[in-house]
Amino acid sequence: MEIENEQICTCIAQILHLLNSLIITFLDDDKTETGQSFVYIDGFLVKKHNNQHTIVNFETYKNKMKVSDRRKFEKANFDEFESALNNKNDLVHCPSITLFESIPTEVRSFYEDEKSGLIKVVKFRTGAMDRKRSFEKIVVSVMVGKNVQKFLTFVEDEPDFQGGPIPSKYLIPKKINLMVYTLFQVHTLKFNRKDYDTLSLFYLNRGYYNELSFRVLERCYEIASARPNDSSTMRTFTDFVSGTPIVRGLQKSTIRKYGYNLAPYMFLLLHVDELSIFSAYQASLPGEKKVDTERLKRDLCPRKPTEIKYFSQICNDMMNKKDRLGDILHIILRACALNFGAGPRGGAGDEEDRSITNEEPIIPSVDEHGLKVCKLRSPNTPRRLRKTLDAVKALLVSSCACTARDLDIFDDNNGVAMWKWIKILYHEVAQETALKDSYRITLVPSSDGVSVCGKLFNREYVRGFYFACKAQFDNLWEELNDCFYMPTVVDIASLILRNREVLFREPKRGIDEYLENDSFLQMIPVKYREIVLPKLRRDTNKMTAALKNKVTVAIDELTVPLMWMIHFAVGYPYRYPELQLLAFAGPQRNVYVDDTTRRIQLYTDYNKNGSSEPRLKTLDGLTSDYVFYFVTVLRQMQICALGNSYDAFNHDPWMDVVGFEDPDQVTNRDISRIVLYSYMFLNTAKGCLVEYATFRQYMRELPKNAPQKLNFREMRQGLIALGRHCVGSRFETDLYESATSELMANHSVQTGRNIYGVDSFSLTSVSGTTATLLQERASERWIQWLGLESDYHCSFSSTRNAEDVVAGEAASSDHHQKISRVTRKRPREPKSTNDILVAGQKLFGSSFEFRDLHQLRLCHEIYMADTPSVAVQAPPGYGKTELFHLPLIALASKGDVKYVSFLFVPYTVLLANCMIRLSRCGCLNVAPVRNFIEEGCDGVTDLYVGIYDDLASTNFTDRIAAWENIVECTFRTNNVKLGYLIVDEFHNFETEVYRQSQFGGITNLDFDAFEKAIFLSGTAPEAVADAALQRIGLTGLAKKSMDINELKRSEDLSRGLSSYPTRMFNLIKEKSEVPLGHVHKIWKKVESQPEEALKLLLALFEIEPESKAIVVASTTNEVEELACSWRKYFRVVWIHGKLGAAEKVSRTKEFVTDGSMRVLIGTKLVTEGIDIKQLMMVIMLDNRLNIIELIQGVGRLRDGGLCYLLSRKNSWAARNRKGELPPIKEGCITEQVREFYGLESKKGKKGQHVGCCGSRTDLSADTVELIERMDRLAEKQATASMSIVALPSSFQESNSSDRCRKYCSSDEDSDTCIHGSANASTNATTNSSTNATTTASTNVRTSATTTASINVRTSATTTESTNSSTNATTTASTNVRTSATTTASINVRTSATTTESTNSNTSATTTESTDSNTSATTTESTDSNTSATTTASTNSSTNATTTASTNSSTNATTTESTNASAKEDANKDGNAEDNRFHPVTDINKESYKRKGSQMVLLERKKLKAQFPNTSENMNVLQFLGFRSDEIKHLFLYGIDVYFCPEGVFTQYGLCKGCQKMFELCVCWAGQKVSYRRMAWEALAVERMLRNDEEYKEYLEDIEPYHGDPVGYLKFFSVKRGEIYSQIQRNYAWYLAITRRRETISVLDSTRGKQGSQVFRMSGRQIKELYYKVWSNLRESKTEVLQYFLNWDEKKCREEWEAKDDTVFVEALEKVGVFQRLRSMTSAGLQGPQYVKLQFSRHHRQLRSRYELSLGMHLRDQLALGVTPSKVPHWTAFLSMLIGLFCNKTFRQKLEYLLEQISEVWLLPHWLDLANVEVLAADNTRVPLYMLMVAVHKELDSDDVPDGRFDILLCRDSSREVGE
């Protein structure tokens, strides 16, 4: 009877719980007549009105209710509401999860009032200090009275296990953690005031110690892993069950996380002598060993921690308790229970800690003695404590193993006592972790599932997720099937897996002896293995590089859905590392085929501790088929596509490298091959296993129909609960089966004892057969419950398309026909070696002779031999053109056959030069390739000449493919044949990274149609040549030998292709002569590159008036500026990549043919292929040139000459972009050329310098004479003091700003004139940058003018003056470092002035002077760099104003003297109206007091000095040195905390200005711009310079600084100069468009006119299309952002009906737009609220501009004669631009078509760019965003070939601006 009553009570309770969960349904259904409805939820009355749920007061609303509602709620208990009403705190705890699931929540900030101790909400008038101490909570707001608001926060109640039955089973036995007090005794670890000052060092430099700990652990682990093989250190497979390794395999990411967790404890060890908690150690007796902390700090430098021997000895001594060192380790282990702050985030394990929020680190408080002690507000959680102990154990084992002879101290039985104590601690913490599970599991019998933290998880959830992943797998398979005849999954399963003739009987791990290097692939007979690889389809007749890449990418993508299919199919879940390491071969193999059931079985061990025996899990038949198919078909395709040269994987400790005698000699290629043939789940692009970040992306989207998604840990707990309660195991009868299920999930090692009453049950307690049977039964139960087998037979249609079958059968014959076509010999006239000689005499005359035998041999090889493909590398100037020119003339002389050949060059500027050279003497008929593409073959032309873009164009490819048919129809003969395909400078295919996407179309070209392919270059060593040929789809260079297996695989890959290798002729190596020895090469460091270049050019033209020169500049802007400024001296031609093709050809031709043209200025595109006879000088101003660009540039000097490499002094070293060659280095140029070509080095030997470093022995007599004449002219100019005209002001401005940038915090340019002065011209003589002598002169570094004289930075000697930059002394003067002072003059930049003399930065003493850099003051002088003032003059490094003189660092002019070392203009003699004076507050007058130690005050002072302008409205661009007009267009508006990704500078409970604890705050009074804000902006600057992948890697690199914005700013400021240069370089085009308003014309974009109809439209047509698109969107109520993101035409009526921004954003959020945006695009690299906030306040100026233009749009519509339609309002317009910005496909297409723009990576820059105007084809102006919409529409249009998927790839975003 009692049992029945108990069951009845249980049922009633369950029913009540279900009714409570259905309350939300009543909220929608139970409505009153007034549109309102009320419902009671856990003590609160909830009102629903207009889809809004709010908590209301019953007493207030009861008179407004219907009578029935009022009666219903009158008896309700509103105790919870009354409790909230009476609570004095603003924040009130609420235990109702249903309430929080029903009512919208918000995030609010709260603080603890110091006076009352109450928790109050942060309001507008809350003080600054209270705001800094605030913390954030997720709350529900409640209006408890008039203007009285409370906030509810969810706090879960303790479940009452004593109060009778409860409707659900909670997994929270207890919540209070006393372990840190009882076991670790943390309350006895007290810190005094001195300790706190020491600990502040850690928090001030946490990033440093994070990096230090990681590097130390990494180094120790490397040494420990390299110990000789023994059972204690090296893991072997036979050691799998019987023992565990001491030094375990760790991935690098794990080592990094361990290192970050160890940072606080490494700090404690390094300061063991200073902290009072180590008092026991500090009281050691004389003679006992002490820790030399200074030596440790030196040895453990984080940049290179190689010296770890001493550290290892200390660790060994601590483990052995030598002297009192054991006390140190004892204290450190106890300190592990202290929470020193959040550890690193990321990875699978970190998801387990996501429920732990608002953790507070150790906070100091004052005890009764006035000492600061550690008050533990929140100790480490058990899970985090366990991770910390994991890290400590790893460090102790690795460090001790570095020097210990053996590792017996870690033995479980005979080890030292310290190790045993550590294991006890770890065991207790692990047990506590198991009990502290924070996930609430509730049974939901009605839906056959459970509720995990209020989220429903049942059978339908699992099946929906599983089949969504299966569908994704099938979709990717279909993409491969479009290119190949792919066998289906069912085909392979039926043919092999289900075929009983194929046996899979083999021993499995943990059962029988393991056989190394086995795989179930070896069990498959050879006859089956030969037919599994798919064949190419007929329309895809080439296995090009692009197709190979498509194969590898597709297989990488379908790996992730397969992982999820396995995860759900096994049922008893894996932790992610176990799933990640599944392997089908090798020593870590765990994937097998069961010979009986023909299902895949997985034998895995518990990866987390490696101590348990293997677990057997069996997959269902459907999943088994997919896994088998992946291994046998897809992985083998991937291996073939990657090729034998694939080497992306590095050796990682988690790999077991077997089969090599010396594992240290294993190359990356060997490792990659092992990984590909062993592990299942790989990311071949990155060279790593599939990362957890990639894996978990599916959880955010799938299953589609689930209202709430579970994270990975919740899903794991849910799967365990399903297996426990829903799969059908009964505790009474299936005792061992239930226990087996728990162990298969690795859920608890004590499950048998605690739950099932079995004493320490494990699978080893039963026989091996029984263990296998129990596990197979468990898997069978899960498979039956999930129902995957029922879908097995209908999951994949076994029938194939009849056409595919026929085509597949015919593929073999097609293949042989293709090969026969390629290998057949062409009918042609007999050739003779005499043909080449005759051709040479036609071209050069009867006296023609070859240069050497190499040239003769190569001409005969090209003309006579049957080699189908030839590559030639010859030095520049060798005569490579003749190598194909003579054979072409010989071919043209054949009468019976007409040969048509093609020549392609890299740049348009070479076209004119090539056509002139090749058409001379009338030997060949030459025409542009464009004629052939547009009109076809004319029957007359022998050679068509074009550029690489023509070679890659689809029209050219189609013309060649249809050649035979067209020729036969046009000329009625087959005697018109394709001759040579010649590609000049073919190294560009590999080295021009930013253009590689343009070359993709070349892979579609049928090379086999040509008689011969010839590739020429002067800079293509074997490695570059081989890679370049493979990039365009060819086989590559011929190898000396080929293995038979490799040959067979090559044939498989190249079905239907020509696999001829290219023969390489390397004339440079054959001749063994270093190229360019005939040119004199000089590297000069100068103050101003343009100024020095102008001097050199003027000198050259004075000596050789008829000569020519080439100047290579770095940017297009510089090209134009040089051309404008030099035009007054000589005739100039300038070229860069932004010119149209016709203009480039015209200008090049003009420079070559017009003898009056002197200088050709351009970017690096002018350095290749141009042949100019009168050229005598090449000057390079681009310090980013690589060795190839240098050789090409110098190679223009055919007969000798001078080459100058000019770089600016103190310039930052250029950094090579990803995939590019590094820039040339300072030093011997010839040695770098030798290294590039692979020639023997002569460094330090005779003959090292050839034409460089002052050597003239190898130069021609003419070149030597030219050098001597240039030298004599320079000496003559110096002697005669010839004045050279200054450069334009633009150069002076830029150079002066560059010089001042390192001294000034701002680059504000100001030209101020003061009474009695003139700029750059005075009554006296002025000498600039020359050695001049005058009577009375003053040297200054800026443009300062006085009545008496002007001094420049050179060595000028006068009677009454001072020499600068030298140690010269005059009658009444003093030498200073940069400025000289005389009786009537004062020098700038050092600011020390006296009546008779000045000493600055020297130790010179005069009669009436004081030395600078001190605080000394004399009667008539004051020293600089201090704030001292005297009667006569004032010199200081701050802004000082006196009667006699004033200091200034800008262009100031005075009557007598001016001194400058500060940034403001000078005020002299009351002439304030001519100057702008900016007063600066004296910091000494406004001193303030802040709490904190001296260490904090010192750090605060250092930071203030490093970032001095944070008291103003400073931004990071000012800090970098940009001018105000540049900042106006580059300014990073919209950058706030939400720009930062989650976890980066977003910690709570710390100072909001510096992210440090309040007691360690380094912010200072009056600081307007916080360090945290500057860190946000610095991060945005880094984003400006990186694409998505590079930025993601950068975020990983700065992980140590994620919680330390101050440390990050220090790290950022180190490379400020480099960043400044990069922005100037990469955004020069952007500033030209937005700042100077340069016009963008679509007609200047060659690719745009060729590849898009939009670029041929008029402005009217573009506008009509724009309005039509918006009209359609408005009519269909399409969601705008989603449409422009990926052309998805989803409906969202609420968006179009929204009246304000808030409602608009809510509508987007409701349909999940922002969620999809973050998961699908680069928006995921920002914070979760970043895109949403763009609709609020960030774009006010742009919004007002747009709204003002709405009237203009209406006028345009009326002018166009269309019906006026509503132009999109601002929010819709902004949605469009955001969608376009995140649409990667569209952006790549636009950037490819519109050549004047490049990629931008910040949304504000994109919005500004979208609003500039462009010239349409009819020269009418339209906004760029209209053109964007037109291109977007074209990509989605049906009349575009292949629709949206045939997208032309774009250039690399980091490309050079010039071309």
UniProtKB/Swiss-Prot annotation:
Domain Helicase ATP-binding: 861-1038
Gene3D superfamilies hit by this protein: P-loop containing nucleotide triphosphate hydrolases
Enzyme class: isomerase
Region (Disordered): 1318-1485
Coiled coil (UniProt feature): none
Bias (Low complexity) ranges: 1318-1461
Induction: Induced in absence of telomerase TLC1.
Pfam families: DEAD (PF00270), Helicase_C (PF00271), Sir1 (PF11603)
Basic and acidic residues biased stretches: 1462-1485
UniProt cross-references to PROSITE patterns, sorted A to Z: HELICASE_ATP_BIND_1 (PS51192), HELICASE_CTER (PS51194)
Binding site for ATP: A874, P875, P876, G877, Y878, G879, K880, T881
KW Electron transport (keyword) present: no
Residue stretches making up the Helicase C-terminal domain: 1095-1244
GO molecular function: ATP binding; ATP hydrolysis activity; DNA helicase activity; nucleic acid binding
EC number: 5.6.2.-
Keywords: ATP-binding, Helicase, Hydrolase, Isomerase, Nucleotide-binding, Repeat
UniProt function note: Catalyzes DNA unwinding and is involved in telomerase-independent telomere maintenance.
PANTHER family: PTHR31583, PTHR31583:SF2
Protein name: Y' element ATP-dependent helicase protein 1 copy 6
UniProt organism field: Saccharomyces cerevisiae (strain ATCC 204508 / S288c)
